[in-house]
A protein has these predicted regions:
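Charge-rich (especially acidic), low-complexity segments
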Residues: 146-195
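Hydrophobic pocket/interface hotspot
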Residues: 16-20, 26, 65, 107, ...
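Beta-strand/loop substructures that line and gate deep hydrophobic ligand-binding cavities in soluble
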Residues: 67, 79-127
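Glycine-rich portal/gate segments that line the openings of hydrophobic small-molecule binding cavities
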Residues: 38-79
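Residues located in well-ordered beta-strands
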Residues: 32, 62-64, 95
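Hydrophobic ligand-binding cavity/cleft-lining segments
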Residues: 1-45, 51, 180-195
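A conserved amphipathic terminal alpha-helix motif
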Residues: 116-155
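Short, surface-exposed coil-to-beta transition loops
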Residues: 4, 58-62, 87-92
Length: 195
């Protein structure tokens, strides 16, 4: 499975980078996540529960960051086990590009799954991954609004002055990656699939 998308954020590149590398922020934002902890330099353990169709399981996995170009980009590799429910592994590239409205978070994820999850079919898996990614970004956006209310107020004021609504978020797409880049987006879906 491969997913690629981008998302406009109202925060600066550095603010987004800091949040995507904060285990506590990720734990709040990744659906079903109950554990994100550092196990070494640029290495993390994650725990999460998820349900895809009729398959429910508790997943444990690991993520390792590489090619780190703070605060602009990094790559991450992940693998996870969910017992008989399945397993997954993959990688993601996350890029934060500054712009006048804040920054754009772009990501590309490649992932493979096995076990009962793989038997559900690609359409169901892809749909669940995209839904998890969307949920991650909604949570991440809310967390950024809590941490940086002035950035969002400025965005909303600029949109009102222009007589338009606040900029719509672009793309969607998944990735379970409890890690960075939301990583956010991709991370959540990747983690979900890899567990």
């Amino acid at each position: 499975m491969e997913m690629q998308a981008s998302r406009q954020l109202a925060v600066t590149q550095q603010q987004a980078w800091d949040a995507l590398n904060d285990p506590e922020v990720l734990k709040v934002c990744i659906p079903g996540c109950d554990k994100v902890e550092a196990t070494g330099e640029n290495q993390y353990a994650i725990g999460m529960a998820l349900k895809i169709g009729p398959v429910s399981a508790k997943f444990k996995g690991n993520i390792e960051l590489s090619d780190i170009q703070a605060p602009a980009s990094y790559k991450l590799s992940f693998e996870g086990q969910g017992g008989p429910a399945g397993h997954g592994k993959g990688s993601a590239a996350v890029v934060l590009t500054p712009n006048a409205a804040g920054c754009e978070l772009g990501y590309t994820v490649q992932a493979s799954v096995g076990g009962k999850i793989a038997q559900l079919g690609q359409r169901l898996i892809d749909g669940a991954a995209k839904a998890m990614a969307e949920d991650f970004f909604k949570r991440f956006d809310l967390e950024m609004q809590k941490q940086h209310p002035a950035s969002y107020a400025a965005r909303d004021a600029a949109a009102a002055a222009a007589g338009a609504e606040a900029p719509a978020e672009s793309g969607g797409g998944g990735v379970p990656i409890w890690a960075w880049g939301v990583g956010a987006v991709v991370l959540a879906a990747v983690i979900w699939l890899s567990r």
